[in-house]
Amino acid sequence: MTMLSTKTLVYGLGESGLSAARALAERGYAVTAADAADSENARASAAALGEFGVQARLGAGPEVLEGVDRVVVSPGVPPGAPVLRAAEERGVPVLSEVALGLELLGSEVRVAAVTGTNGKTTVADMARRILEEAGLGHVVAGNSWTAITGKLEEIRSAGRLVLEVSSFQLHYMRDPGFEAAALLNVRPDHMNWHASFEDYAADKQRIFGGQSENDLALLGARDPVCAEAAEGLSARAVLVGEGGTRVEDGCLYLEGERLVRVEDLGFAGRHNHENALFAAALARSLGASAEEIRRGLEGYRMKPHRMEVVAERGGVLYVDDSKATNPAAVAAALAGLQRPVVLLLGGSEKHTDFSEVADYLGGCRAVVCYGEAGGRISDFLDSWSESRAEILRASGLEAAVREAEARARDGDVVLLSPGCASFDEFSGYEERGEEFARLCRAGLAEVQRGAAGA
């Protein structure tokens, strides 16, 4: 059987599923598509695929596997979905859209890949900035970026790919053999998708599959899962945060070479400085020099909703860290602040453990717990006897901002670092962050109007 005659089912008609089906159809592969839903969005996706000659079945069950040789699955489809369980029982291979994209690219492109519970989008973005500064052709794709199958010709032309991959995408990937691969950290997250933390950690470590001794593996030195994983790798392993690749005496060092002073960077926080080291190592693997890395990092500015100052009034800073959707990210944010904090925690429930956040409550004046998960979080923090922070409850984000404003004092930081997903109120962390900024700026406008009328 030739690859062109291999019949592929693309299951899940989100952005990556649409991209995968189009890429296969445009290249003459036999492809069908399906989705468990029969919603307005699914029907729109099916209509779009019809223009490429791809038939799509909606409200589909395991019957769509009839005559199928393999399945390409969208990241939003959990492993326990009936179609995927049936595929496993029948021995039908399942792969992610990213794995399909790498297959279609072949070996002609140099790939530097990054994953981790927190920081992977930032690292990919920093690497992008460095490669731009170096004038090296590249494409950034995967997870938070454009689907890889939608950029195949552009990637081939550039010759270099910075690839951000999630645990969902890695779950259905076998031995990708990346020239450089980074695992930043592994903390409990997405436990509603993975069977256990051990399974989640194992999926993250798939990023190192298929590497040889000539390849580079980067791992977070301060993360216990990463430190243990480093011991059994085939590639050359570098622990970021200790040894030659570290932050020390106000400088960033990459494998013993001083790169840049922290004071010359446009972003703060130890976790972000270590993110910069990961990005520097990935960019160097793709051909960037030390001087190009320095200039790239000095010119880098953080993406929105990542410790972004959105307002300041009465000596209080209002900081949007809406991208912090798990407790480990909240802990990292609190560890990087030197001022008293009024913290906003909450959102949609993922049943994660907030013990790591509780360890940092000594720097908090108050914690406002809100949304669907707010009750559980506030009950847990109330029981944490070592904390002197005032624990408050609010119904939603707007009420939480008002509570925070009432308690913040000159010199404080009001920090939205929710530690939860946003879907109880918003479409995603971006909309949540934008609403937080709007509320904070609206409060500033009210103060200014009051001052003008005084």
Language-model features: locations:
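Beta-strand->loop->alpha-helix junctions that form or flank phosphate-binding loops
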Residues: T32-D35, L58-A60, L95-L100, S234-D249, ...
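Hydrophobic/small residue at the entry helix of a nucleotide-binding pocket
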Residues: S16, V123, A373
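Residue-level signal for inorganic ion chemistry
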Residues: L24, V71, V114, N143, ...
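C-terminal helical cap/extension that packs against the catalytic core
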Residues: S45-V54, S355-D412, G453-A454
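Phosphate-binding loop of NTP-binding sites
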Residues: A25, V64, P75-A221, V225-R236, ...
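Nucleotide phosphate-binding/pyrophosphate-handling subdomain across enzymes
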Residues: T2-K7, S19-R27, E108, V260-A366, ...
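Short internal beta-strands
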Residues: A30-A37, A217-A221, L344-L345, C364-A373
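N-terminal leader/targeting and accessory segments in enzymes
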Residues: M1-S96, L100, A268, R449
